[in-house]
Amino acid sequence: MYSEENSSGKPLANPDWLLNHHRAKIPERTAFAKKLAKLHPKKIVDLGCATGLWLELLNEIMPLDCEFIGIDSDIQSLEIAISRSRSWSRKTSFLQLDIEKDVISIPSADIILAFNIFPYIKDLDAFLNTLNAKIPSGILAVRQYDGASIRFGPMATAMRQKIEQDLYIAIGNSEKFRHYDLDRTFIALKRSAYKKFEYSFELFERTSPFDQEFVPYYEGTLLWTCQHISDTSAELLNKWMNEDVHLQNRYFYEVDLVALLS
């Protein structure tokens, strides 16, 4: 079975999955990192930093006087992040915390990164309000993918609808994470204690022929989908994949909510 869980059992958090995802989106993520650099932070805290990929990217862009703190609950991921950071010439540290249970222990910073972590937080309203009360002067930078917008094709509409329905039935009520969390996130951000809310929707799109940096993420997404849908739908999806094994007539897109709050 294709595994995308980390050592703590969190879905879509396996180190290999995260690396493939990151490499696929380097252009978009680099552009956002440069936007954050224009805010001239002196300290950045990355909530759910996992293996440190975002901090590694920011390390190439931020001035060396900007301190980094990475926080995650998974010790294996933190060990990879620590190893990744050893060559950095800046003050860097990592903390093992459950960010929802230990929100009051989150250090203050000029920018708090919350990238695709909200699906793992049960009471998002309480988390945001506690975070704002604890760190009232910093900027909260949010990036949240929308599981409902992930689309690959071209594909017959009936087949697509069946696959999407199967996937929702399988994971829509998962107790491990919320794959369809963009609307809950948007509502929670809007009614939080943050006063300023700058938001946009970022389109990630690729059309064939695909760049080789994108292919592992694309194929991983299809394999992950196959293992959650019904056997009948998985057979159809596998047949569809085999009809174009060289990826000459394919597209992929998804949408992320991107927000800066203060």
Can you name each region flagged by the protein language model?
Residues 125-139:
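A short glycine-rich, Lys/Arg-flanked "PGG" loop and its adjoining helix->strand segment in the class I
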Residues 53-101:
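Class I SAM-dependent methyltransferase SAM/SAH-binding core
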Residues 4-16, 198-251:
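C-terminal helical/coil "lid" or tail adjacent to the Rossmann-like core of SAM-dependent
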Residues 63, 121-122, 135-136:
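Helix-to-beta-strand junctions that scaffold the AdoMet/dcAdoMet cofactor pocket
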Residues 110-124:
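A short SAM/SAH-binding and catalytic strip from SAM-dependent methyltransferases
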Residues 141-209:
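Conserved catalytic/acceptor-binding region of the Class I
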Residues 23-40, 57:
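Conserved alpha-helix/loop element of class I SAM-dependent methyltransferases that forms part
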